[in-house]
Amino acid sequence: MENTTTNPDVLERFLRYVQINTQSEDANCDQVPSSTVQFDLANVLAEELRELGAEDAHVTEHAYVCAHIPASAGAEDKPALGLIAHLDTTEVAPGAGVKPHIVHYEGGDLVCGTVDGKPVAMSTAKLPALNDLAGEDLVCSDGTTLLGADDKAGVAEIMSLVARIAQDPSLPHPALGICFCPDEEIGHGAELLDIDTFGCKYAYTVDGGPIGELEWECFNAAEATVCFEGQSIHPGDAKGRMVNAGNLFCDFNALLPYVQRPEYTEGYEGFYHLEGVSATVDHATARYIVRDHDAAKFQQKLDLIDAAASMLNQRLGEERVTVEIKQQYRNMAEIVRDYPELIDVAKEAYLACGVEPQVLPIRDGTDGAQLSFRGLPCPNLSTGGYCYHGVNEFVPVSSLVKMTDVLQELVARFA
């Protein structure tokens, strides 16, 4: 399929959207949205959808943007298809005041900006994929913030598809449900989407990485909070009496497999990730996330956390280590494997646009994981972006356009 966009609508949209701060806030995870700034982009998108003919486009009280596009002639009886992306960006890197610009990349280090007189650069040694991007125009931040391609590239691509359909309603497509969710980055993106009102039989999230990625397997995920209760005694009188909670944490952490940390794992290998720890002599708290694609191995990891706590308590002769485990999401492969046609059609759409599909396990979760278990099978498609969650994040302009082409081919195959 040839690129039908000479002055890319998708690029114009993307450059506007990334300048609207939408960082979610994990500290406010008990409310949706976790940050009111997500309404800023939500309201813009709803208005643009209405201008493109989606008369029912609206923003819910929880900052979900929902809209429906009628089917093309002859496809009225086909099942409705959902396209979903998320509004929020991560808070692990600066995300306000994004200043996007386009770098014509000719090879070597990709320099996106300068901070304190020093270049912010990504080398081909750290990112070999850069070797395939020489000659491309790349959208980057100025190096002081993330870019926001995760997931505003997906948002822009879906919106650009809607614009194409508005311009030419004869483009084949079933009835489409469009949804932009809040708080995906903190694990709450799909929780409050009303699936019945959304009205789709299948859906795709557009939230992946480099163009061609096609994902229908994700981690099983849980969060473990481990608390350590110490006993503070003057160090000079501490023998046989002091229990240092900080040292208890160190002992506990040493019982978890060293090689099962994120920095030593890839592919289908799961991990324990220490996200944060605070410690005094009296009290320490550690927060881990636990991940594995395999359900049995995932449970083994959780069991080991409990066993490590029990071992320390037995050594101490009293309960000073407690564990609280919160399940987060499950591997959507349990559901999506029963819908192989969703994978086959996505592969066909990529190939029709000259893109080689790359079926990969997600080393993370997506809104599609929650949605799949709620009855809406939902694989994940690429956006074209690289280096998410950091100041080196970028996306090729050609990938933004090509991914919009892929979505056009995809919806045509459901018509």
Describe each model-derived feature in a short phrase.
Residues 26-28, 56, 170-175, 258-273, ...:
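Flexible, glycine/charged-enriched surface loops at secondary-structure junctions
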Residues 280-282, 356-409, 414:
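Zn-dependent metallopeptidase/amidohydrolase metal-coordination segment
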Residues 29-78, 82-84, 88, 99:
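A non-catalytic alpha/beta surface segment that caps or lines the substrate-entry region
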Residues 247-264, 271-273, 320, 330-378:
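Active-site-adjacent substrate-binding region
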Residues 159-166, 251-258, 409-412:
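Short glycine/serine- and small hydrophobic-enriched flexible loop segments
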Residues 75-175, 180, 200:
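Active-site metal-coordination/substrate-binding segment of hydrolases
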Residues 127-130, 136-149, 183-306, 310, ...:
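Midchain, well-structured core segments that form catalytic/ion-binding scaffolds
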Residues 7-35, 140, 329, 389-390:
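N-terminal capping segment at the start of a domain
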